[in-house]
Amino acid sequence: MTPIPNGGPDPDVLDEVCLRGELTVIGRIRSASNATFLCEAHLGERQAHCVYKPIAGEAPLWDFPHGTLAGRELSAYLVSVALGWNIVPYTIIRDGPAGRGMMQLWVDQPGSSLGEVGDEPASGPDLVDLLPAGHIPPGYLPVLQAYDYAGDEVTLVHADDIRLRRMAVFDVLINNADRKGGHILCGVDGQVYGVDHGVSLHVEDKLRTVLWGWSGKPVDDETLETVARLRDQLRGELGDQLCAHITSREVDALHARAVALLNNPVMPTPDRRRPIPWPAF
């Protein structure tokens, strides 16, 4: 990969490789509910790993129109870019080996077989973790009590981290129905990324997330200023961009959620029957 001064890959170069590179499928990610492939994109001497989800491989869902998940993933990325929070990895829709589909840059994580040699996972709890019942480390927030598969009582916790707090606000805005713990990735670059946004941006309330630790807490002023800018952009070029991938009703619903958060700047509470995605990890 083309290096930059700190020795890491240049994000702009990786974006270009993902957009224009020749794709080779390395393998299938079988834990995914839809057809999902790990690919290597080559452009000249440059290469990048990407996740490829062909539209033809999308499993039918009762509450989301068939063939729309790729557009929702791209729309979530566009919202992430507009917010300036760098939550969603670079995402496009392009042709691939199994037809047109969503393409997203792979996130190298510490300890991953695709990461750099020497990148080891940090010690201690993960950003989202299951711990023995009542064990809440400093800097963590409890979400719920549950039983694991062995029948032992556990506590679901997540870090009280600004990166996760922004992701929680992002999920409220895009109405994310599937924020599992495994959809939160710590990159070797120190960023925290959110992936798998195919079931988002519905007009009906479908928020399901493991990031409930801030329920009922006020949203800070800096975040509200960012949400206000998003609200305004949705009535301009951003709204037009999104309408190419989701319906105008869904764009209006996104705008309405931004307005609602600004009018009542408090994180929502889990008052629905199924507020946690299953499985949570």
Residue ranges and their predicted role:
Residues P65-H66, G187-F281:
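C-terminal catalytic region of ATP-dependent kinase domains
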Residues M1-L19:
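Juxta-kinase regulatory segment immediately upstream of eukaryotic protein kinase catalytic domains
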Residues I162-M167:
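Alpha-helical scaffolds flanking conserved acidic
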Residues I174, G181, V199:
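Short, glycine/acidic-enriched loop or turn micro-motifs at the edges of active sites
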